[in-house]
C-alpha cells in the first residue's frame, strides 16, 4: 500500500480512475494518512487485516522527544503524483488532498497500531500532558506540511481525517486535541473539510477548528447537523452499509440524504465513511448517476 502511494504514476492513475469510471465531480488524491510519517523516517508497515503497525510505539517521554526531531525530507513522489493527476484531470475536475488529523496519527503512534477505544493514547494524554503537547504539535505540523505539499502541487481543496476522534469526550477534545487540528488546518488557505467518525457529540467543537466544511458520518441526519452547524457546508452522509442493501434501499436512502442536505448552505454528497472493499463498482456508478439527477 505505502509503495503504491509513493509510485507517482500509479498513485496518479488510481486518483483518476474513479472520475473516469464513475463520473464523480472531484478526485481524492490516492495516498494514506501514514505517508507523511513514512516520509519522516518513521518505521511503519501496513499489515493485512490489522492496518498500520509501528515497530517502535511512541509511548514514553523519551520516545516522543526522539520522534519530534524528525522531518519530511523528500516529498518529490507526492508532489509528482498530485501534479500528474491534476494535469490528467484538467480544470473541470479538482483534486482534493488529504491528511490524517493529529489525534488519529498520535493514537496510532502511541499504541503501535489501531485499537478499539484508544485507551493507551487517552491515558498518555492525561499522564504526560507536556509530552502529549509536543507529540500533537509535531503531528499537526507534519499533517500541515503534507497538506501544503499537495496544494503546492495543484490540489484545490483538502480534507483532514480524524478517524478515531469519536472515542474522546467533548472536554478532552476541546482542550487536548482541537487546538492541534486547528493548527494543521491553518497551514493552507484552500477550501478545507474536517471529518471524523462517531463525532455527533463533537460537531460544534470541530466546526470551530477553521474549516469551511464539516464531514458528517451516517450517525446523524443532515438536517439536524445543519441546524447545529449554521452556515457550514456539509459533506456526507450516505451510510456505506447501504451499498450492499439493494438498489431500492440505497436509492431511497440517497434521496433522503440529498433532501436533508438542502438544509445546509451547500452539500457535498459523499459516503459517511470509506467504500467497503467488497462493494460492487457498478453500484457506485449508479449512485453517482442518481445524485447527478436529483
Which residues are covered by each model-predicted region?
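Short, conserved acidic/polar surface loops in the N-terminal third of protein domains
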Residues: 38-42, 57, 106-110
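A short acidic, glycine/proline-enriched capping/turn motif at secondary-structure boundaries
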Residues: 33-36, 51-52, 60-62, 102-104
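Active-site loop segments of alpha/beta catalytic cores
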Residues: 74-294
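A glycine- and small-aliphatic-rich helix-loop capping segment at beta-alpha/alpha-beta transitions
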Residues: 43-52, 111-116
Amino acid at each position: 500500500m505505502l509503495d503504491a502511494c509513493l509510485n507517482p504514476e500509479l498513485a496518479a492513475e488510481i486518483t483518476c480512475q474513479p472520475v473516469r469510471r464513475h463520473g464523480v465531480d472531484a478526485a481524492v488524491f490516492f495516498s494514506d494518512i501514514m505517508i507523511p510519517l513514512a516520509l519522516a523516517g518513521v518505521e511503519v508497515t501496513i499489515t493485512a487485516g490489522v492496518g498500520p503497525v509501528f515497530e517502535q510505539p511512541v509511548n514514553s517521554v523519551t520516545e516522543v522527544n526522539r520522534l519530534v526531531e524528525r522531518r519530511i525530507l523528500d516529498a518529490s513522489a507526492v508532489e509528482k503524483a498530485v501534479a500528474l493527476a491534476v494535469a490528467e484531470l484538467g480544470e473541470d475536475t479538482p483534486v482534493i488532498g488529504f491528511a490524517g488529523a493529529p489525534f488519529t496519527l498520535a493514537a496510532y503512534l502511541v499504541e503501535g497500531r489501531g485499537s478499539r477505544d484508544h485507551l493507551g493514547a487517552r491515558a498518555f494524554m492525561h499522564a504526560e500532558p507536556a509530552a502529549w503537547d509536543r507529540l500533537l504539535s509535531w503531528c499537526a505540523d507534519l499533517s500541515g506540511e503534507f497538506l501544503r505539499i499537495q496544494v503546492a502541487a495543484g490540489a484545490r481543496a483538502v480534507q483532514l481525517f480524524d478517524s478515531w476522534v469519536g472515542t474522546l469526550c467533548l472536554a478532552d477534545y476541546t482542550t487536548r486535541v482541537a487546538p492541534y487540528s486547528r493548527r494543521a488546518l491553518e497551514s493552507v488557505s484552500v477550501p478545507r473539510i474536517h471529518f471524523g467518525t462517531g463525532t455527533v457529540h463533537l460537531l460544534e467543537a470541530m466546526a470551530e477548528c477553521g474549516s469551511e466544511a464539516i464531514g458528517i458520518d451516517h450517525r446523524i441526519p443532515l438536517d439536524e447537523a445543519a441546524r447545529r452547524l449554521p452556515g457550514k457546508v456539509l459533506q456526507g452522509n450516505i451510510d456505506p452499509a447501504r451499498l450492499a442493501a439493494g438498489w431500492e434501499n440505497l436509492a431511497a436512502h440517497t434521496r433522503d440524504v440529498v433532501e436533508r442536505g438542502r438544509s445546509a448552505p451547500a452539500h457535498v454528497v459523499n459516503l459517511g465513511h470509506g467504500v467497503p472493499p467488497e462493494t460492487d463498482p457498478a453500484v457506485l456508478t449508479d449512485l453517482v448517476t442518481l445524485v447527478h439527477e436529483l
